Amino acid sequence: MRLLFKGGTVVTGKGPRRADILVEGEKILDVCRDIPAIGAQVVDVTGMLLFPGFIDAHTHFDLDVCNTTTADDFASGSRAALRGGTTTIIDFACPNKGETLHDGLRLWHEKADGKCACDYGFHMTIDDWNETIAREIDDMYAEGISSFKMYMTYPAMMIGDEAMYKALKKLKEKGGICGVHCENAGVIDALIAEKKAAGENGVYCHPETRPDIMEAEAVGRLLRIAEQVDIPVVIVYTTNIEALDEIANARWRGQKVFVETCPQYLVLDDSVYYNEDWLQAAKYVCSPPIRKKADCNALWRAIRRGEVQTVSTDHCSFTTAQKLAGRGNFTAIPGGIPGVETRGELIYTFGVAKKKIGLGAMCRVLAENPAKLYGLYPRKGVLAPGSDADIVVYDPKADHVIRAEDMVGAADYNPYEGFVTKGSIRQVWLRGKPVVSSGKVLPGSVGKYLPRGKCQL
């Protein structure tokens, strides 16, 4: 059966254009104006924007953290992703300390296979470095994993500068790409100790012990290590002006640096941590913390100028009951917020509709660039002949109010509660099959594991 999406505006990384899309099976056959409806079922998308299926390259489903497990597993999290127009997620396989990379990959396949409703892949977390892990890197490429992650903070996961240098050298041999969580762990620990010694324990202590300059310091240190190795790296969830300055300096030196940010750093500000209602403030605890309005504006400018390549979510959801476990100890509040269900509508509302970015930029940061960065292009990330028929149908006139009660994810709150979006996602198609209709997730979708190639950006 052929499908003909007729009457819409197709959005690519270069911008919007009027075109029809002809689909057969799982693939796109043609994209051009006025395709005749011969032997095809017509999907009327008059007045709609048609995006490639969004790619969220930074999710944490079914993750054990802070003595609990994220509210969303791969089943609920992927359904929430589909509702938000995301047809592909890349989650993080996380071996426990002392385990092999194979152990971590095996566990994440057990969590996701047969449960994930959208297509999916994995990054591999490197939390240690030795000869065994170095040998395993080769095996990961054979398994379709071409991207990795390291942490400069969190005692259970962080890796030192020497190990990071050695790991990056190995990844350079293989043509791999690595994302790094950049915060200065030592200074954070000292600031936390100072707060506790002073008897301070409010949620506001979270951003005050993880300041922007200590994120920027870690970004600068990472980039100097990467410069020594001569390898491009990804700065994940970039939050502030100072970090952007470090990145700009590295690019001026001739380095290739890729930058990711997230909706929470674009549309929220740090006033959320100073709410007198402890639980309301705790809902926004994530690391790095949400920053100031000036940082939001700087990130939007960076997207517009092409200095930020991707907008992911760092989706790491918890219930209010789980957040309450940190009452009395701000460092024990589980860090993370839900985001996969609202990302596309927030970027359109606060970016495109407010004329901070264009439709082409929205397509680049949500679909095209993540596909290229993580070895999925042109199968994913573009509406073109031969690509997977992953299609997001966006109605720019169907405004709606974000409410936790309407969400399909497992968290019982939404950090954007009450926000009014300009337009909404009405349909989502995954490999030529409808998975969202009239804004509702349809049952029965089963995602495919996606082995990935090398970076193409």
Where are each of the predicted segments found?
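Histidine-rich, glycine-flanked metal-binding segment
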Residues: M1-G53
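C-terminal cap of metal-dependent C-N hydrolases
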Residues: G8, A325-N329, P385-P451
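Divalent metal-coordination and catalytic microenvironments
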Residues: G8, I21, E26, G47, ...
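Metal-associated gating/positioning segment near the N- to mid-region
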Residues: V45-K115, T132
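Short, surface-exposed connector motifs at secondary-structure boundaries
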Residues: T86-I90, C116-G121, S146-S147, I225-V233, ...
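Alpha-helix-loop-beta-strand connector modules within alpha/beta enzyme cores
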Residues: H102-C118, K166-V180
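Histidine/acidic residue-rich metal-binding segments in metalloenzymes
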Residues: T132-V311
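His/Asp/Glu-enriched, well-ordered alpha-helical/loop segment
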Residues: N201-P232, Y284, R305, Q309-V311, ...
